[in-house]
Amino acid sequence: MSKISLCMIVKNEEDVIERCLNSVKNFVDEIIVVDTGSIDKTKQVVKKFTDKIYDFVWCDDFSKARNYAISKASYEYIMWLDADDVVPEETQKFLIKLKPNLTKDCYMLKYNVAFDNEKPTFSFYRERILKNDNRCKFVGAVHECITPFGEIERLDVAINHKKVKSGDTNRNLRIYNKIKKERTLNAREQYYYSRELFDHKKYKQCVTNLQKLQKMPNVWTENRIESLNILSQCYQILGDKEKSLMYLFQTFKYDTPRANICCKIADYFYTNQMYEQSVYWYKQATFAKDVIDKGGFVEQVYYNYYPYMGLCCSYFYLKDYQKSNYYNEKAGEIKQTKEFLLNKKLLENFMK
């Protein structure tokens, strides 16, 4: 039977590290923890689970720290997690059964990073369990990843990201600015640097850098589509609604229409009181297939609740109260929000 080395990097994670390690202790064979400078009780907690704790002097490079952890691994496969990740019981049971049959080079698991009443609302696949050979290397100082290699299998189980505190919100941008002084960013770095600018509300800088990204070769399709979506959001915020719409339509050059893009196009028409057009685009969102198997980011709300609410409101203004009520009820089947209840009460007056 193949064995698995868990490789982690941590810093000041006393609030979450025990929760994480409790969720993996029954299926991993070795726990390696690299500490990048904790001043709390993280190490004391980790010692309950392993004596393989190593110090690493932080150098503004997540990949170097993670690769150092991998270098200490003894077994055929490595698994990596963040301290605020949790392996659900269902996934634990699945991996215990899988271990005797590990043969692939790379196993991808879903990563749930946002929740509504414990139901995942934002998910995507990450490379999670990998053969421990010279291909198993993280790249990227920030937003680091291992490029999936060899035979790859996607597993229909998930890791949950359960953050309990926010970290240094300026750290990633600071690291990217440091890299930019030393060399030109590659396409992946350019994408994530632009996202950091957006998150810091530097919208004009974000636009400039995303437009630069559009001219770069070797941009991953998912990053290219999302970069156009972010460009659209920037122009929306900057008050240029027509450019915002243009960038949404440009995403269609790279793949079939995504649910979130269809909803945003529908929002444009709804805001402009063009309700037949908004109906069309909200319906397209409900027909869209999720893109998680392509490596895309899936925001579940755009596949059902959000377009159902949009259809409810659009049909209301078209005076088709039967259809308005129908889609409000469909939205209510997903979640009974304040908006659903208000619509229900309002529509009762028009359904008499």
Name every feature range the model reports, one short phrase each.
Residues 44-68, 72:
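Conserved donor nucleotide-binding strand/loop of the catalytic core
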Residues 2, 63-70, 87-212, 218:
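Catalytic-site signature of metal-activated, phosphate-bearing donor transferases
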Residues 2-5, 30:
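Cell-envelope/extracellular polymer assembly enzymes that use nucleotide-activated donors
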Residues 78:
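Short aromatic/hydrophobic "clamp" motif used to bind/position activated sugar donors
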Residues 7-27:
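Short, well-formed alpha-helical segments that are part of the catalytic scaffolds
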Residues 15-18, 40-49, 90-91:
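Acidic helix N-cap motif at the loop->helix transition within catalytic regions
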Residues 23, 35-45, 58, 82, ...:
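A conserved acidic beta->alpha catalytic loop
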